[in-house]
Structure formats: structure tokens, C-alpha cells
Amino acid sequence: MGEAAVPPELDTFPAAKMAQTNPLPVPMGPWKITVYDQENFQGKRMEFTSACPNIMECGFDNIRSLKVECGAWVGYEHTGFCGQQFILERGEYPRWDAWSGSNAYHIERLMSFRPVCSANHKESKITVYEKDNFIGRQWEISDDYPSLQAMGWANNEVGSMKIPCGAWVCYQYPGYRGYQYVLEADHHGGDYKHWREWGSHAQTSQIQSIRRIQQ
């Protein structure tokens, strides 16, 4: 195939081009991310304005640094938007620990990524429920909380969640640490009835801090 040629040092993938391999609806919005195959923004680089399900298809073996210029993104440990999630908001990430440094787990791989299309910091709401299927005690949240327990949530687990608007990142531990779960109003219809729907890496219903995603 003609696309097998080595890409130039800087290539731009507009939404129309990436749509060939993107299983998600092509977003139409102000998203832009530049990824590098070496730390500190060195080596091969590529610019994207839409989702990339497999960076290896672009000639990379891994992403080792990146710059988010527009919008919010979520990166994944594995191809196909699987594995641990890493929220990527506007700014520079010179090496892997810049996006997973608050994570309790040593993960240096970032193999796929996509825009967080519903991020809206000012108009975000989420309701957390004590049990699966939106049962039990509930609490509507519209602000950032580094510790749910300190604000009165009874335990360190959340059974299910509803997101009518915006996008959130939930963390396993207080202080925005541990596994990250990016939850959005435009995924699952905003209804996450069980912790297994939070991501392929979810192994527990433990959630102890939560914040709105910055667009």
C-alpha cells in the first residue's frame, strides 16, 4: 500500500484522514495534539486533530512525550483505546511521568488517544450512587473534590454514576492519585451503571477523588 512509506518528520492528520481508522464518530471541534517518539519533544513527531487508535500504524513504537495545544484528550496504555487511561489537558508532557506521575503504577506506554469531546468545565455535573444500577445513597456533584470521604461520602467506593453534562476524571485514591477513569456525558449515554463500564482496566469500584476535565 502507498501509505506504508515512512512519514515525514511532521505530518498532520486531519479528521477526514484519520476517519479511515477511527471507530468513533469523527469529532468536529478545536482539538490538537502533537506526539513525539522520544522524551523532551525529540525525535519523530506527528500532529493529530482526531482520535488515533494505534500509534504503531504511524511508524511509532511508543509515545514518549507530547504537547496538547487545544482541547482535552485521553491517552491509553494499549492500542484500541484499552488499558490504563491518562487524562491529557492543555500543556506540555516531556516524559511519561508527566501524565502518569500521580498514578501509583509504573506505566510508560501510551499507544492510542482520542479527544474528550464533551469536556465543559463550567457546565459539568455528575451524580454518584452508592450501589450498582443507580441504587442507594446519591450525591450530585458540580465541583472538584480531592477527597469524597472528607466531604461526607460514606465509603471509598462508588457503585454507579450518571453524567448529564460535561466530562470527569475519577481517581482511585484521594488527592487525584491511582487509576484514572475518564467518564463522559456522550459515552454510555452518560449512564455508568457498573464500575466495569469505567474502562477496560477497571478492577474495583474504589473512587476517592473526582474533578472536572478542563477543556
UniProtKB/Swiss-Prot annotation:
Gene3D superfamilies listed in its UniProt record: Crystallins (2.60.20.10)
Keywords: Eye lens protein, Repeat
Stretches assigned to the Beta/gamma crystallin 'Greek key' domain: 31-70, 71-117, 124-165, 166-214
MF (Gene Ontology): structural constituent of eye lens
Organism encoding this protein: Gallus gallus
Region (N-terminal arm): 1-30
InterPro entries: Beta/Gamma-Crystallin, Beta/gamma_crystallin, G_crystallin-like
Oligomer status and interactors: Homo/heterodimer, or complexes of higher-order. The structure of beta-crystallin oligomers seems to be stabilized through interactions between the N-terminal arms.
Positions of the UniProt region annotated as Connecting peptide: 118-123
Family the UniProt entry places it in: Belongs to the beta/gamma-crystallin family.
Domain notes: Has a two-domain beta-structure, folded into four very similar Greek key motifs.
Function: Crystallins are the dominant structural components of the vertebrate eye lens.
Gene name of the encoded protein: CRYBA1
Protein name: Beta-crystallin A3
GO BP, one annotated term: visual perception
